[in-house]
Every structure is written in structure tokens, then in C-alpha cells.
Amino acid sequence: MKRFLLSRRQRHLRMICFHNISLFRANGDSKLIKEYGDGFIPCFFILESIRGELLYVSEVQSGSLRKLSFQELPKLTGASTMIVLKLVGLVPSDILCTISSDKNGIIDDKWCVLCTYTIDLNKLQPINEDTVLITGTNAPVLDLIDGSYTLAAEKIKPLKGLVSSHKRNISQVKIKFSLAYSSLLKLNKLLEYSSQVHEEINEISSKIEDDFLSLKNQNHWYMRTVQKSIETLEKEVLQRKKSKKNIEMAQLESNDTINHSKTELSLMSQDESINDDYGSIYSRFVQIKDRLDQLRFKKLYQLIGIFHSTDLFNSDRGYIYFEKPSSVNDVINRLKLKPLNIEILLRQAGESTKHREYVNSQLGYYLLFLHLTAIQIFKAPLPYRLMYYGSTSVIDSQYPLYFTDQMISKHQAKLIKAIHYFNADILQFKQILENYRPT
């Protein structure tokens, strides 16, 4: 019994047949068609996905009556409604020598693609091969589980019967249509099952939305905490700059009030006072820089404490190694940033959907930590711009630093570039920390 399909897909394909196989077009050279058109042509077909992925290559067959049936088609598992079908035939060397300018260079038969079809399985016309005649050249007929189909553009003609069928009078008996109780019972069960499925889908959707909102709120809390720390750091740095500017203005005013003597003794004393002032200003600058360094180390230590709630500093799965320092001044020497390994990340993300979401969130936290530490705290430029968007962060506005459920080749190439650029930023910042010289 044929099944009714809402949508025909690759997995419903059972057999492929080609009608009117020919090496020549219908409007080709009539002389060649007459001479070589009636021979047996060895053929096979190639089945590909719409993305160019190879699905199946058939065996070579030579059919009779210009018709080939490939019945040993394996069971496909694809869910796509589009396929690419190619028919490949063996062209004899005699034909190649006839149409080629190089007569001596062709000695063997050649395999050539006779036709290529991009087929939408839901846009085919149903046919019955026993009652219609297909007139097109190399016309495919696809046998699916719900019937036989050919291309919508193919021309078909109904076959005329050799013997006219016997005509008889139509019975006048009225048929009364009825519906059995068992059919109604089955329909009721189907409706109950459908309603249960819809209820379960709604419950699962609501749970997913609740989990997503809770995770989103948690990320917002981290962002607010980090933003408050950044604002506090900027205010303290601004106050330090103002105090430094006031010291400079006071020194300039004190220098303007010095009485210039015309004697050599007064000039010597003036030089000595200038040297003393220079020494005092330099020492104050050193003190201010030392306070600024202390402030940076303190903010870095606070930032590390904030990110300790994530797994960035986990000894097994984390990306940052940090050993508790003996003093705040030693915090940058205890901080070690690890570069990303694309092979390890691909293996972890491919285990399950939960592992992929975990890896994406950790990559987002790592990017945010590097951005805040380098740009906000140490004011150090990085070669590539880091943009934090949670578990879908990007680099330079175009390279995604996250994994998807379907890793197409284009996304994977951009992801590899993003990891390369991110490792370059890590290397740049590690060199800055190694060359950083606090007072």
C-alpha cells in the first residue's frame, strides 16, 4: 500500500530509471544519431546533495530498448528535499574521433556526463510508466515510496490501447457511504495523541525559555559587576591625574616666585634650587606611578576574583593558570594565559549539545577577561578587536568565536581564523606583562 507523504525527501527514494538514453541531443547531428543512436550505452549515475556532497554512485549497466533501471539503490538517510542527479555514459572512441580535431590523440573510450538535473522532490509530476510514453532524452523517473515521478518539464504522452475496451452500462445502484465505529475510535485516539504531543512541546519550550532567561540574567549580573569595577577604576585614575596636574601647577607657581639675582652667587643658588625642585618632582612622579601600579594590580586581582565563579581558572578544563601571590605586586607574575587549541575545542564541542554550549560560554568569558585586563586595566593595545556577545562573541566584527550545531565549511574556516587571531592577542598581552616594570 502506498504511503501519503506531506513532504518527499531523500530517504523516500527507492529506485531510479532513465528513459531514451542517448549520447546526442535531440537536435544534434542526424548522421551521428542514425549511425550510433541505436547501440547499447554503458551508464551509471551519481547522486549528490545540493551542497555537492556525494551520496551514492551506482554500478555500470547497459539496458535494452534505450531504458535503464537502477533497482539496487541503498536506503538513504538524508532529510533534504533537493538532490543533484548526474547520468554518466561511456562515449566510444569512434564518436570522439568524429567530433574532435585531434584524430590521433583519442584512442580510448571516455566517460562523459550526459546530463545533470537539480531536482526538487516536491515539484515532480506523478506518472504511471505502463500507461504513458516519455519522449524526452535521458529523462529520469524516480520511484519513491508513494509512487513514480518524473520532472515537471518532461513531456509525456498517453499510450493508445490496441484493443478497445468493452463498454457497458453504468449501474444505477446508489451507494450509501458509511463510517465504521472502529474508524471513529482510531481517529479519536489520533487526536488525543496529537494533543498530548502539542502539550509536551509547549512544556519543553517553556522550560527552555526559563533556563535561557536564568542564564541570561546571570550573565547580566557578571557584566554589571565588572562594569562597576571598571567605573571605579576609571574614577580613581582620573583623581590621580588631577592630583598630578595640581602638583605640576604648584611647582610652576613656586618657580615663578623665585627672585632672580644678578650676582653669580644668586645664580648658583638658583641652579641648586632648580635641581632640588626637579628631584622632588621626579620623586613625586615615581610615587604617583607606584600608586597607579598598585591600583592596577588591585583591580586585576579583583577581576580574577570575579571570574573565579566561572571555570576559566579550573586546573583541568580552564584556560588561565593563576597561583595565589604572596603580595599584590606579584599578581602579574602568577597569571598565565593559555592559547586555544582548535583540535581540543572541536573534540569537546562535538561530544554533545551541552558540551558545545559550555565551550561557547567559556570562550566568551575568556574573551571578556582578556578585553577587560588588556584594554581597561593596562591600557594595552591588541592587534585584533575583541567583541563580547556572551556565548556568541566575535573578533574584528566578522570572525565568530563559537561553535554551531551544524559546522559548515565556511563557518569552520572563520572559526579557525578567529582562534588564530585570539591567540595572537593572547601572545601580545603576555609579552606586555613580561616587559611590564612596576616602580
Swiss-Prot record:
Keyword set includes Nucleotide-binding: no
The keyword Protein transport is assigned to this record: yes
Protein name: Vacuolar protein sorting-associated protein 38
Coiled coil regions in record: 223-255
Entry's Gene Ontology cellular component terms: endosome; endosome membrane; fungal-type vacuole membrane; Golgi membrane; lytic vacuole; phosphatidylinositol 3-kinase complex, class III, type II
Subcellular location: Golgi apparatus, trans-Golgi network membrane; Endosome membrane
Gene encoding the protein: VPS38
Additional notes on this entry: Present with 1070 molecules/cell in log phase SD medium.
